[in-house]
């Protein structure tokens, strides 16, 4: 009985010590710590969440981004391997094509910005647009500006909710854009077709260009009608 009593006292004593230590720690913390203080996050922390974040959706999106990055990397590795296996002459032509495509892309982006600035500051009729585009094409012989013009009038067609005016605009501009310079670019990048007489090749290619722009008209009208 005595030993049991002593054991119980020892246990109670140890519990009292533990409780006292915990209370001392809490008192010390309450005296020295500002409870409103927000600890700074590490500068290199990438992921920061709030209570509204759906972690599962976030991780799913991250997985998609990672997979796309992996696919891009693998494709690039295969292309790099193929490029290294090509003859020197072939690689030199690829370099020339890259330079040309970069120039077309830069011209396209620059001319698109010019056209959007023009459209945002002025109000045009169909004939005004045709005259403006014709002036731009006369001052610039590049392919980039012609591609930019096609994109521009397609965007304008979507903003104009009058189908009749849209058709009129595309009809006028299809002939304006498909000029001799446009046909020359198509001729340079198209394989020769021996079934077409040389005398009618240019007319044929011009017709192809007009048809392509009219197809853009159809897609625009379909977008407008819904």
Curated annotation (Swiss-Prot):
Induction: Expressed in the early phase of the viral replicative cycle. Keywords: Early protein, Host cytoplasm, Host membrane, Host mitochondrion, Host mitochondrion outer membrane, Host-virus interaction, Inhibition of host apoptosis by viral BCL2-like protein, Membrane, Modulation of host cell apoptosis by virus. One of its GO terms (molecular function) is protein sequestering activity. InterPro entries: Bcl-2-like_sf, Orthopox_F1, Poxvirus_F1/C10. Plays a role in evading host innate immune response by inhibiting host inflammasome activation. Interacts with and inhibits NLR-mediated interleukin-1 beta/IL1B production in infected cells. At the host mitochondria outer membrane, interacts with the BH3 domain of host BAK and prevents BAK from binding active BAX. In turn, host apoptosis is inhibited. Its main location: host cell. Homodimer. Interacts with host pro-apoptotic protein BCL2L11 (via BH3 domain). Interacts with host NLRP1. Interacts with host BAK. This is Apoptosis regulator OPG045. One of its GO terms (biological process) is negative regulation of interleukin-1 production. Pfam families: M11L. Belongs to the orthopoxvirus OPG045 family. It is found in: Host mitochondrion outer membrane; Host cytoplasm. Residues 32-37 are annotated as: Essential and sufficient to inhibit host NLRP1. GO terms for cellular component: host cell mitochondrial outer membrane; host cell mitochondrion; membrane; mitochondrion.
């Amino acid at each position: 009985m005595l030993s049991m009593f002593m054991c119980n006292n020892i246990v109670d004593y140890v519990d009292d010590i533990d409780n006292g230590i915990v209370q001392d720690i809490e008192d010390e913390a309450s005296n020295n710590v500002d409870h409103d203080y927000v600890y700074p996050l590490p500068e290199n922390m990438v992921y920061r969440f709030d209570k509204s974040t759906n972690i599962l959706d976030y991780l799913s999106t991250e997985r998609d981004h990672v997979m796309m990055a992996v696919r891009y990397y693998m494709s690039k590795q295969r292309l790099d391997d193929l490029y290294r296996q090509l003859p020197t002459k072939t690689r030199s032509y690829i370099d020339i094509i890259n330079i040309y495509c970069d120039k077309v892309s830069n011209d396209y982006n620059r001319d698109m910005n010019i056209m959007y600035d023009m459209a945002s500051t002025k109000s045009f009729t169909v004939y005004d647009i045709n005259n403006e585009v014709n002036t731009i094409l006369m001052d610039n012989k590049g392919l980039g500006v012609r591609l930019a013009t096609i994109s521009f009038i397609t965007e304008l067609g979507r903003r104009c909710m009058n189908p009749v005016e849209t058709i009129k605009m595309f009809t006028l501009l299809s002939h304006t854009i498909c000029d001799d310079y446009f046909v020359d670019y198509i001729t340079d990048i198209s394989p020769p077709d021996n079934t077409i007489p040389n005398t009618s090749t240019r007319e044929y290619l011009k017709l192809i260009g007009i048809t392509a722009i009219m197809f853009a008209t159809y897609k625009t009208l379909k977008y407008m009608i819904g």
